[in-house]
From Swiss-Prot:
Homodimer. It comes from Pasteurella multocida (strain Pm70). The gene is lyx. Keywords: ATP-binding, Kinase, Nucleotide-binding, Transferase. It is an enzyme of class 2 (transferase). PANTHER family: L-XYLULOSE_3-KETO-L-GULONATE KINASE, SUGAR KINASE. It catalyses: L-xylulose + ATP = L-xylulose 5-phosphate + ADP + H(+). This is Probable L-xylulose kinase. Pfam families: FGGY_C, FGGY_N. InterPro entries: ATPase_NBD, Carb_kinase_FGGY, Carb_kinase_FGGY_CS, FGGY_C, FGGY_Carb_Kinase, FGGY_N.
Amino acid sequence: MNYYLGIDCGGTFIKAALFDKTGKMFSCVRENVQVISEQAGYAERDMDELWQIFARVIRQTIERSQVSPQHIKGIGISAQGKGAFLLDQENKPLGRGILSSDQRALTLVKQWQEQGIPEQLYPHTRQTLWTGHPVSILRWLKEHEPERYQRIGSILMSHDYLRFCLTGELHCEETNISESNLYNIHSGQYDPKLAELLGLEGIIAKLPPVIAANQIAGYVTPKAAELTGLAVGTAVVGGLFDVVSTALCAGLDDETKLNAVLGTWSVVSGVTQHIDQQQTLPFVYGCYAEAGKFIVHEASPTSAGNLEWFVKQWHLDYAHINQHVASLEPASSSVLFVPFLYGSNAGLGMQACFYGMQAHHTQAHLLQAIYEGVLFSLMHHLERMRKRFPQANLLRVTGGPTKSPIWLQMLADFTGMRLEIPQIEETGCLGAALMAMQGVNESADVFQAQSMLHVEPNPAYFAAYQAKYQRYQQLTTALKAML
């Protein structure tokens, strides 16, 4: 039997899982990977440590499965988008990798907004412009760390770097690099004019060739094989942006379905075969894992990470939290929570807060407000996406909160949409493994027997949630005015 390895390098963990061509998972190992934040707004990773953890997780996955490495026919990597993982001219890590959640370029991005730069980029890139984009990080380095900037040999994103460690080959993968603001989505190529507009003249020469998600990028080297336990010569494909991987596993194949991801980030995505030139809102487009298709998505770091922070502060377990929230009448409390601990989707520099607390409120009310606030923030994206996809009547939901029945029911009641929850445990790993199957011409039948959990909205609570959502919007508008 042939097997396929999918690795997911996310915001908190690196996970590796081994699958057969039906998508059956035989083993999965995950390990926490540190985010270094030595200054306000910084979010970095030690690149050498990242590679060591990556290699260790692969080795442990193979050992746990008891599968012979020779039977692993392909490898794919899914990872966070954007950020910048730089190599010097000798292909050594050039400082730490900078993550998409890094905000050191905030002042620079505000200046670009004042100058109308995003509006000039958008017709060519179909991207917005924010602090985690490679271009923002690169321009910040050019201004604040010019010696490091001058030493750049190659610009990669995290899965490009890890693929390089496995194969020794340098590429930028299409689903990720198409959202860099250096890639012209109409021509399908890097565009020097975009770099010039951003004050990054000459930087295109530092970008490796673009490779498709399911294209073989190289083969496992002897050095990498020794560390990982993989067989020398195992094929490694381009891999993909984790948002694309999740959409793929959610079965998005037309414009009647949307995918909502509740994880470190709130993400809403849809898939289309064309770029709608008539839309006035700046929808974000990127290349999809299927040729000729685009992913359209909205995202912000305003999701379940907010709850995780409170869990750590209060030393709570999730079963206890769900019981607390389920004990309250839906949308009945005056307490609002703005889930901006890690960033905002309502304005640059906005921060988290509770509002509307009174003496009779309990911990349960605060927890309920966190659940609601995460969904209210998600709704900001969902409302915009439903303008782009007006035929969408079904929401497929993935991410950690899908394990919480009360949270799912809240989402259905609030949106009024029918929910489907794909019963796939590791969407990042499976999507990456699927690209590996395609790369080696395996006839995969991963989704033929996929089961779904269904959640129907309760219309009795729709009006109450909508009223509270209006208060949430008024609060974020007022907070934005204070900046």
